[in-house]
Each structure stands twice: as C-alpha cells, then as structure tokens.
C-alpha cells in the first residue's frame, strides 16, 4: 500500500499499521521512478507548491518578454506591468473562487463539472431577485441595501443546496462524481435557459458598487474578495477537522470510514462548499458585469477551475493538494491566457493548450497506486 495513504493518522498508528511514511523501507516506488522523467516527477510531487510558484515565475518572465516585444510597454513603462496584472486578476476572479471549492472536491477524490452551469443559474436567480421592476422583493416593497443583503444570502443558500444535490447523488446515490455532475451540469443550464427566455431584468446601480467601486481609479474589490476567500479557505483546509477529513477521504475512503469519519456526510459538505464558492463567484460576476448571457455564461469555468487545481499541485487521484496552490494555479492559467491573446492565438487553440497543461500536470504527479 502506498506509504502516504495514512499520513493523516497519528504517528504511532502509522507505525503499528506499517504506514510510517518517514521510513524509507516502507516507501513504494513508481515503476517510472528511474530516469529523468522520474526525477522530475519526484521533485514535482515532493515540492508541488514550490514547483507551482516556480512555474508562475517562468510564465511571468515569458509574459514580460512577449509583451515587451509586442509593444515595449512591459519593460519600458511600469504601468504596462500593472495594467496587465490587474486585468489578469480581474478576469480570473470568478473561476478562481470556484477553483477554491473545486480544490476540496478533487482532494476528496471527486470532481464537479456542473460549476459553470451552476454559476449561470445562480446569476440568473440573483438578477431576478434584484430586479426593481418585476422582482419578488420589489413587489413587496423591499429595495436598496436590504434587498441586496437578502438576495446575497438567498443565492449563497441556493448554491449550498445545489452543491449538496451533487454531493447527495454521489455520497448517498452512489453515482460516480463525473456522471452525477455531468447530469446536473446539463440540468442547471437547460432549466436556466428555459426560465430566462423572456427574462430582461436590470441590476440596480447600487448593487454594482459591491464589485465595481473604484479605489485609486482601479476596480480592485473583486481581487480583494478573492484574496480574503483564499485566506479563509486555507484556514479551513489546514486548521479544521473538516480539512483533515477531506484529505483522509481522498487518501483512502475505506480507511477513513474505519477511523470513524462519516464519509457520506463529509462528502455532502464538500460539494455544498463547492456550491457556496460558485454562488460567491456568481454574486461578484453580476455585481461586476451587471448582465449575463444565459447561453454561454460560466461555460468553460469548470475546466479553468480544474486546470488551476491540478496545475496547483492537487492530485486528481485525491488525498493531496493545497488551497494556495489552486490560487497560484489560476494565476498561471491567467498569465498563459494573456500570453496567448497577446500573440494572437485563436480562442479554440487556447482551450487546447489548457487541455495539454492538464494532461502534462497529471502525468507529472501520476504515481503507482499499488
């Protein structure tokens, strides 16, 4: 059995069960451990966060060279660097917040393909609640800040329930995560499109200030929200029993169950947390943009989130990952998009590059499961 499967157990228990991961005699080496590829994989596996940071630095250097060759602004003007990074951060806030929830899901050994469609559905529901002409809150005389607060709470609860639906299908319905979330992805998108055929709400100007208010001439509130949520999710992952249980389930679900963890309940909470993160992304999206194309909004966010999590060092096999790594991974994806757009690469080829990055990252982290 892999030495790292039970690292969440006390040291004495690991030694008793023969899982002492500090004992090299018990270590299981991959058949591909030899050679240059094996060395790269070993370095990536043991220092995934440092590897991710190094990859970000390399991407930034490439970005600097590309933009410098393109218009000279990156090296010649400090403002060029600032503008480029502000755009990268702003453009990736929504998928970046979703990636934080996706990180927990993938560490637990699951996946959620429905988050893009979920964001679209939640965005539509939020716009309906906020509409001061035909919305339900305006109909009963609730407008302004009270309406904003109620709408935000309702959308977060809806996101929690939608995520819990995925978790329930997986944990209690025993459906594979891929199948369950593929089904809900189609359901969420289809229902939203059907319900918004004659939908033309207006987002109040006051609500737009939640994410569009300028500080120093720049729209940075969404970035601040993102960083604060990263810090919160990091604390939840590193300092709470819930975070340890997530790792335990992803490492070895049977062992986690035998140790007393209520696996179905924890899985339900994990997917509910993913739904909450998607709801927050939808709230910031509507506040920042003020409108939504219900046919395409959120499309591809699931792939961006998965790519960020995997590039950030989280194992697709579960049991290993880092919330901060998911944040860095999303920055890498954002810088890559900026580079490709700068050199004029078509959008469909950009998506192909993302796919190659996911495959390469998984190949680097892949190990023998025996």
Model regions and ranges:
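Membrane-interfacial amphipathic/re-entrant helices at transmembrane-helix boundaries
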Residues: 7, 12, 16-97, 135-148
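Hydrophobic core segments of alpha-helical transmembrane domains in multi-pass membrane transport
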Residues: 52-65, 102-103, 156-159, 185-190, ...
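Alpha-helical transmembrane segments within multi-pass membrane transporters and channels
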Residues: 134-184, 328-329
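Transmembrane helix-bundle core of multi-pass membrane transporters
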Residues: 173, 177-239, 266-269, 288-299
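Transmembrane alpha-helical segments in multi-pass inner-membrane proteins
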Residues: 278, 289, 293-355
């Amino acid at each position: 059995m892999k030495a790292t499967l039970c690292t969440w157990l006390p040291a004495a228990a690991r030694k008793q069960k023969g899982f002492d991961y500090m004992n090299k005699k018990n270590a299981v080496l991959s058949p591909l451990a030899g050679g240059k590829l094996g060395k790269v994989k070993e370095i990536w596996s043991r220092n995934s966060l440092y590897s991710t940071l190094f990859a970000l630095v390399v991407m930034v250097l490439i970005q600097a060279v590309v933009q410098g060759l393109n218009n000279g602004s990156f090296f010649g003007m400090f403002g060029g660097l600032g503008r480029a990074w502000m755009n990268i951060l702003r453009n990736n806030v929504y998928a970046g917040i979703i990636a934080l929830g996706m990180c927990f899901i993938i560490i637990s050994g699951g996946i959620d393909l429905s988050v893009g469609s979920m964001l679209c559905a939640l965005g539509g529901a939020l716009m309906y609640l906020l509409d001061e002409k035909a919305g339900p809150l305006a109909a009963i005389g609730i407008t302004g800040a009270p309406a904003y607060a109620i709408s935000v709470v309702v959308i977060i609860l809806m996101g929690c329930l939608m995520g819990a639906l995925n978790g329930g299908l997986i944990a209690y319905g025993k459906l594979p995560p891929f199948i369950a979330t593929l089904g809900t992805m189609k359901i969420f998108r289809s229902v939203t499109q059907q319900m918004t055929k004659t939908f033309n709400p207006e987002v109040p100007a006051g609500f737009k200030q939640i994410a569009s208010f300028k500080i120093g001439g720049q729209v940075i509130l969404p970035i601040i929200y993102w960083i604060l949520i990263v810090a919160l999710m990091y604390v939840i992952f590193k300092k709470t029993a819930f975070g340890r249980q997530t790792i335990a389930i992803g490492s070895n679900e049977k062992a986690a169950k035998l140790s007393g963890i209520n696996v179905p309940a924890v899985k339900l909470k994990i997917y509910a947390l993913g739904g909450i993160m998607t709801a927050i992304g939808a709230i910031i999206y509507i506040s920042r943009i003020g409108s939504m194309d219900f046919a395409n909004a959120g499309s591809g966010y699931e792939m961006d989130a998965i790519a960020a999590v995997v590039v950030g060092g989280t194992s697709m096999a579960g049991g290993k990952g880092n919330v901060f790594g998911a944040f860095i991974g999303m920055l890498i994806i954002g810088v890559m998009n900026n580079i490709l757009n700068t050199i004029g690469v078509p959008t469909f080829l950009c998506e192909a590059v993302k796919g190659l990055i996911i495959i390469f990252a998984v190949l680097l982290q892949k190990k023998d499961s025996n």
